[in-house]
């Protein structure tokens, strides 16, 4: 009897261990996620626009590994609200997060939209993933406790020389006593070595993670700070781009003559260099040279990451997503900044690579960066999160589904929106004034066709896609270095906007 009892007990224990082993194996078999954010990266890279013969071989390499979206658009053309939207899966018009919001203040009890939201990295953590992150991921780094292993972020966008090279950071705001702050914008060769750059140090940290063994699948996030201003990288990256070889983007000095007043107010950026200033001072090509140099530096660091992943045990079972928070204008529409609802400010690179995805595929249909959250969940075999406001792109990548009816929405402040569909862009401002562009015939968006009867039905169709919700500015969200948004928040909220002394001081 006892023998029979112990035999049954042994069988039960063996069965339990087998089930436990199967469960562990099931967890390990889930794909890992390598999540890469690049700050202020526009579509000039070689696998998309290949502007001015830019040298970005590792972006080409990533494109060959998976799917490149050539017409992806940001939730907002500003770091803070764009990243908050991507990490929550919620539109700025839903949350009221239109400006810069401290990472720990995004999810709060007094914001009905975000009070119980699950951030993207958290969703993986809650589903058995080991979460890790370093660099600029949210507006600063990340909310407290976001990662099992966190590398943090070097504050600011340094290192900095003792004295700025060209731009004082105030621009015309000096005449307003600097009341709208000071930008980090400047350009020049600095420091002497890549090893002094925070992005290089962050990649070193990531490479250490690839050398470890994990019992769980991992979610590993890396946030690059360049090519965000200041446009400082070592001289060797500038040497790739002799000034005589630099192209400048198309520009018309009277381009803004048909823009509604709200659009002009939004484009009033007193601290930033204007295109006219850049032309007259001879600095235009130098600014572009510095931007291209910064992008090539990031490309090199990306190559280090791809090499390390390739040589790791995780090479065949890791999903890669690389994205930027918005585009960046290099003289288009009169300035050097993101900060607008036009194509050059909202469009940015988006790549996916990994198991069960085609290689070397390009998709030219407009899509949203907001789709990153649901797309990663589906690729990882995780249950969809009902709070996500955008659609997964998996079927589009795998089967070309949804190419004809896809669109992208960008929001900039309360009730200012752009809608991009294939070949057209519609912009509506809070006062109902409009812009409409036929991108097929007018890729530079120089001719506002909003009053052209020829496009009436198309305009109405795009207008129907605008968000139906336009939340009041979140109390903790501020954008006080731009005159129009200071006025908009103060006008629409009881509490006035809080002062910000320096652009990027909290980044």
Curated annotation (Swiss-Prot):
It comes from the Bacteria. Binds 1 Ca(2+) ion per subunit. Its cofactor is Ca(2+). The keyword Hydrolase applies. Keywords: Calcium, Hydrolase, Metal-binding, Periplasm, Signal. It is found in: Periplasm. The conversion to 3-oxoalanine (also known as C-formylglycine, FGly), of a serine or cysteine residue in prokaryotes and of a cysteine residue in eukaryotes, is critical for catalytic activity. This post-translational modification is severely defective in multiple sulfatase deficiency (MSD). The modification 3-oxoalanine (Cys) is found at residue 79. Its main location: periplasm. Ca(2+) binds at residues 39-40, 79, 325-326. Pfam families: Sulfatase (PF00884). The active site is at 79 (nucleophile), 139. Residues 1-18 form the signal peptide. GO terms for molecular function: iduronate-2-sulfatase activity; metal ion binding. Belongs to the sulfatase family. Sulfatase that may be involved in ulvan degradation. Ulvan is the main polysaccharide component of the Ulvales (green seaweed) cell wall. It is composed of disaccharide building blocks comprising 3-sulfated rhamnose (Rha3S) linked to D-glucuronic acid (GlcA), L-iduronic acid (IduA), or D-xylose (Xyl). Has no activity on different ulvan polymers. This is Sulfatase. It comes from Formosa agariphila (strain DSM 15362 / KCTC 12365 / LMG 23005 / KMM 3901 / M-2Alg 35-1). The lineage of its organism: Bacteria, Pseudomonadati, Bacteroidota, Flavobacteriia, Flavobacteriales.
């Amino acid at each position: 009897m006892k023998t029979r009892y112990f035999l049954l007990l042994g069988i039960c224990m063996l069965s339990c261990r087998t089930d436990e082993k199967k469960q562990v194996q099931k967890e390990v078999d889930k794909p890992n996620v390598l999540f890469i954010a690049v700050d202020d990266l526009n579509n000039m890279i070689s696998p998309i626009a290949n502007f001015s013969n830019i040298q970005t071989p590792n972006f080409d390499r990533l494109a060959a590994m998976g799917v490149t979206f050539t017409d992806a658009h940001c939730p907002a053309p500003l770091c803070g609200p764009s990243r908050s939207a991507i990490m929550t899966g919620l539109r700025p018009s839903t949350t009221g997060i239109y400006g810069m919001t401290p990472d720990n203040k995004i999810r709060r009890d007094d914001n009905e939209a975000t009070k119980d939201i699950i951030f993207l990295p958290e969703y993986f953590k809650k589903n058995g993933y080991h979460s890790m992150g370093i660099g600029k991921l949210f507006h600063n780094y990340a909310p407290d406790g976001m990662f099992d292993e966190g590398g943090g972020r070097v504050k600011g966008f340094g290192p900095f020389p003792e004295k700025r090279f060209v731009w004082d950071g105030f621009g015309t705001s000096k005449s307003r006593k600097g009341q709208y702050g000071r930008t980090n914008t400047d350009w020049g060769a600095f420091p002497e070595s890549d090893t002094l750059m925070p992005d290089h140090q962050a990649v070193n940290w990531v490479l250490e993670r690839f050398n470890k063994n994990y019992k769980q699948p991992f979610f590993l996030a890396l946030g690059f700070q360049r090519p965000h201003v200041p446009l400082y990288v070592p001289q060797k990256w500038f040497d790739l781009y002799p000034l005589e070889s630099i192209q400048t983007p198309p520009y018309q000095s009277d381009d803004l003559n048909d823009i509604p007043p709200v659009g002009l107010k939004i484009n009033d950026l007193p601290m930033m260099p204007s295109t006219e200033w850049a032309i007259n001072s001879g600095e235009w090509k130098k600014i572009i040279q510095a931007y291209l140099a910064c992008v090539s530096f990031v490309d090199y660091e990306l190559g280090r990451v791809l090499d390390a992943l390739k040589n790791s045990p995780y090479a065949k079972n890791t999903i890669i997503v690389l994205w930027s928070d918005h585009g960046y204008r290099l003289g288009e529409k009169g300035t050097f900044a993101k900060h607008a609802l036009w194509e050059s400010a909202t469009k940015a690179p988006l790549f996916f690579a990994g198991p069960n995805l085609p290689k070397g595929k390009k998709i030219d249909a407009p899509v949203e960066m907001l789709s990153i959250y649901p797309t990663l969940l589906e690729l990882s075999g995780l249950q969809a999160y009902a709070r996500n406001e955008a659609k997964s792109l998996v079927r589009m990548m795998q089967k070309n589904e949804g190419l004809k009816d896809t669109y992208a929405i960008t929001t900039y402040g309360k009730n200012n929106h752009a809608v991009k569909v294939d070949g057209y862009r519609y912009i509506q401002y809070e006062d109902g004034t409009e812009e409409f562009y036929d991108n097929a015939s007018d890729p530079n968006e120089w001719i506002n066709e909003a009053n052209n009867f020829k496009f009436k039905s198309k305009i109405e169709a795009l207008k129907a896609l605008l968000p139906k919700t336009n939340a009041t500015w979140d109390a903790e969200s501020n954008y006080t270095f731009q005159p129009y948004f200071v006025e908009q928040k103060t006008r629409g909220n009881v509490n006035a906007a809080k002062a910000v002394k320096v652009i990027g001081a909290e980044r």
